[in-house]
Amino acid sequence: MRRTGAYQVVKPRHLRFVTLNLWGENGPWEARLELVADKLAGVLPDVVALQEVREVPGSVTNQAALIAKARGWNHVFAPSTAWGGGQEGLAILSKFPIGAHDFRVLPHSQEDEGRIVLSARVDTEFGETWVHTTHLSFREHEGRKREDQVLVVDEVVQAHKNDAPQVVMGDFNAVPHSDEVRWLSGLTTLAGRRAYYQDAWDMIHPDEPGYTWSKDNHYRERMYWLRADRRLDYIFVTPTRRDRRGTVHEARLLFDEPMVLGGGERIFASDHFGVLAEVQYLTEDPAAGPPPTSTSGG
């Protein structure tokens, strides 16, 4: 895979995070993986979360391992389900060393494939921080199941709580006004519990849709029964500290433009668009004033 592209170096007090549902080996997956690796080379992320990562012995090398090798990164992978002679799961990649890592199985129905949350301790230049990724049930009528799943995801985050901000990324298969996402955003109660995470996109673009499942992406048509133009992929950050750690400074879509091959074929990196967010990790003097806040809901 080529290492091309350029992007401004991340601000010295920030870390840059990216999430993408990789869509396994669907479509021209080898060309898509090239596109993913090239784009990542250009945006210089510190940590990447991938969902629908495939590994099939004898035919598909672990896709996260291929991307990590192309970038010289570290990575961890956890399978969530087995099918087609191989495994599918989640991965976390980073230019920093990855220490302890584990996963937890999420509640899921018999008709659904396995669901997990993968957690990894990333040893950054600012110290250790825990990063989590997940991929929730995809059927639109499974909102109740996704509610159960986000409750467990929050339990996992709380179990790994330390002094640094934590980030939860992935394909939540739920829109911002769903109860499961509103709960994560601190706007409703589930099972008598409350939580609050910053929705990175909403913190920066409260009035923009940020669709990651878009009618502009022709790969989406393979799952034509799922409504298009929805924001399903998120980067959530634990609350901003008084010293400004955890402040979201940037959020934008990624992998939302196609590459045109020699024969005129347009390929996207995936059937989903990705999300990029930049989060502050270096402390500032609290006397500098309170961090910026969003006036938006979830």
Feature map (PLM): residue ranges:
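Metal-dependent phosphoester-hydrolase catalytic domains
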Residues: 1-5, 158-166, 174-298
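N-terminal membrane-anchoring alpha-helices
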Residues: 1-10, 27-30, 34-41, 289-291, ...
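Structured beta-strand-rich core segments of catalytic domains in phosphoester-bond hydrolases
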Residues: 2-12, 29, 47, 51-136, ...
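Active-site beta-strand/loop signature of hydrolases that rely on acidic residues for catalysis
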Residues: 15-22, 36-60, 93, 120, ...
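Active-site environment of divalent metal-dependent phosphoester hydrolases
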Residues: 25-27, 55-59, 83-85, 139-141, ...
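Short, solvent-exposed loop/turn elements at domain surfaces
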Residues: 25-29, 102, 208-212
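Glycine-rich, phosphate-binding/catalytic loops in enzymes
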Residues: 34-36, 64-68, 110, 148-150, ...
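Alpha-helical scaffold elements lining the catalytic groove of polysaccharide deacetylases
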Residues: 142-155
